[in-house]
Amino acid sequence: QASGLGMPNLAPSIAGMPASYLATQIEHFKKGERQSATMKPMADMLDEAGVKATSEWFASLPLPLPEDPAWRGDKDPASLTGGEKLAYLGDWRRDLPSCVTCHGPEGVGVGEHIPHLAGQHADYIEDQLKAWQAGTRVNDVNGIMGAMAKKLTAEEITAVAQYFANVQTK
């Protein structure tokens, strides 16, 4: 979509993501390092200048994020359940850090390489976690997401995806 907000079951929200992150993802689609029957032909149409222009344009769009994201210390651990509990506390018995350790408070994203999860479509988050589990997505830095995803149950994937999809954004 022209807004960059995507559509559930079709395309992720990419508005406001860092241009360098978007350019890297486009290059990964072009090289076959990320799998998508939809994105591969679109990426293949772009030359270097097209990748740069496309990435910069989507990066320039407003990214709807929580106005005042809750930091880990702002939440009472005893009150957290389901996907929010996993997102904020992880499960150290399984060497599974919290999602917000890397993705920031309420999944707002961090820097050039760690995308936002807040307000992202639940189906997209689920699909990506399942792809990392299955080894069909392998373009994460140092294999971190693949290793984390493999520790999640199907129920946990759904719960954490629903949590981030429902984070209230502006």
Map each language-model feature to its residues:
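Alpha-solenoid repeat scaffolds
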Residues: 36, 65, 93, 136-139
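Gly/Gly-Pro-rich "capping" loops immediately C-terminal to redox-active cysteine motifs
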Residues: 4-31, 40-46, 100, 104-134, ...
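Residue-level hotspots at or immediately adjacent to binding/recognition sites across diverse folds
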Residues: 42, 141-144, 158-159
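Extracytoplasmic c-type cytochrome modules immediately beyond a signal peptide or single-pass transmembrane anchor
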Residues: 19-76, 84-85
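Electrostatic cytochrome c docking/interface patches
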Residues: 5-10, 63-92, 110
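The canonical Cys-X-X-Cys-His
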Residues: 1-4, 54, 96-106, 160
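C-terminal capping alpha-helices of c-type cytochrome domains
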Residues: 44-67, 82, 123, 150-170
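Generic structural signal for alpha-helix termini and adjacent loop/cap motifs
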Residues: 2, 31-32, 61-64, 89-90, ...
